């Protein structure tokens, strides 16, 4: 004989199951999507001269350059937020952090400025992505506008485990050490090529193209900002497709200084000299090796 539960009990059970199912399907609070924006000036639209445009409070057109950079930064923040970012931290990364102002920055962004900061840019595992705005290519890159690797006066070349890198490559690797992918860059044609060699799927806003190191073609500022907004939003919408660039095992950072840079470099114990102008900084990982180099 099959015993049947009372109708009232059965109805209550069904209702409980329905409520449990409904509650289980309620969306949980989304994990914050925090983006770190690295900014520079040499890759900004309309900028082709260091002396005329890029030296803080010395260049006659520096204030104009600040406005161009700020416009690109704010366009990128707009795009990131539209694409799903919940927090954007903007690092004022050009020439000792003297280019951006809290008066002008996007109201929904936070600004990291001043010195000193960590050589790893205060990055940590709380970030979901890194982007570059106004970025230039590495020293020696072909037809790259105002190209250099950290210091045009002091550094000739940098290698990480024998891979030639500039600021783009080094920071892609440092971000990867924290499990954070780089998803987007704005800059000139050469900078876009550089990021895509490391992160082929990265979105790139090509705002200008060089015909030499100090000349080239540029988009008008409104067009550059519109492109940056579009590319940053697209990168954010595609975030799930990106993985961090991870350098495994022991790491050697090899730095070839310019003659001027070599003359002022003071080696310390544990750093290997390769030749008159080249030194190797070793570590168990990219962070340890980079911190050794950056401590000089």
Locate predicted features.
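Bacterial N-terminal signal peptides that target proteins for export
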Residues: 2-13
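Bacterial N-terminal signal peptides
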Residues: 12-22
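Boundary of Sec targeting at the N-terminus
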Residues: 28-30
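Alpha/propeptide regions of enzymes that mature by internal proteolysis
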Residues: 56, 60-91, 97-100, 108, ...
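C-terminal accessory domains and tails appended to enzymatic cores
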Residues: 88, 224-296
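A glycine-rich helix N-cap at a beta->alpha junction
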Residues: 107-123
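Active-site rim beta-loop-alpha module in soluble metabolic enzymes
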Residues: 174-182, 186-231
């Amino acid at each position: 004989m099959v015993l049947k539960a009372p109708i009232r009990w059965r109805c209550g059970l069904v209702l409980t199951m329905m409520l449990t199912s409904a509650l289980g399907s309620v969306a949980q609070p989304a994990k914050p999507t925090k983006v770190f924006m690295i900014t520079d000036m040499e890759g900004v639209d309309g900028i082709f001269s260091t002396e005329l445009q890029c030296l803080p409070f010395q260049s006659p057109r520096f204030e104009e350059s600040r406005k161009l950079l700020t416009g690109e930064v704010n366009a990128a923040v707009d795009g990131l937020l539209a694409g799903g970012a919940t927090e954007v931290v903007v690092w004022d990364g050009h020439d000792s952090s003297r280019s951006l102002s809290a008066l002008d920055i996007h109201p929904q962004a936070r600004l990291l400025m001043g010195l000193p900061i960590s050589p790893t840019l205060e990055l940590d595992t709380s970030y979901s992505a890194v982007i570059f705005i106004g970025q230039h290519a590495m020293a020696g890159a072909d037809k790259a506008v105002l190209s250099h690797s950290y210091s045009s006066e002091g550094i000739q070349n940098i290698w990480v485990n024998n891979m030639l890198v500039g600021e783009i490559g080094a920071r892609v690797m440092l971000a990867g050490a924290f499990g954070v992918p780089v998803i987007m860059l704005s800059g000139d044609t050469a900078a876009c090529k550089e990021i895509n060699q490391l992160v082929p799927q990265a979105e790139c806003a090509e705002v200008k193209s060089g015909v030499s190191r100090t000349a080239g073609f540029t988009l008008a500022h409104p067009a550059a900002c519109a492109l940056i907004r579009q590319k940053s939003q697209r990168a954010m919408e595609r975030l799930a497709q990106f993985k961090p660039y991870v350098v495994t095992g022991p790491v050697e950072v090899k730095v070839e200084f310019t003659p001027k840079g070599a003359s002022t470099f003071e080696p310390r114990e544990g750093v290997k000299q390769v030749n008159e102008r080249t030194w190797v900084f070793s570590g168990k990982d990219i962070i340890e090796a980079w911190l050794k180099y950056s401590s000089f």
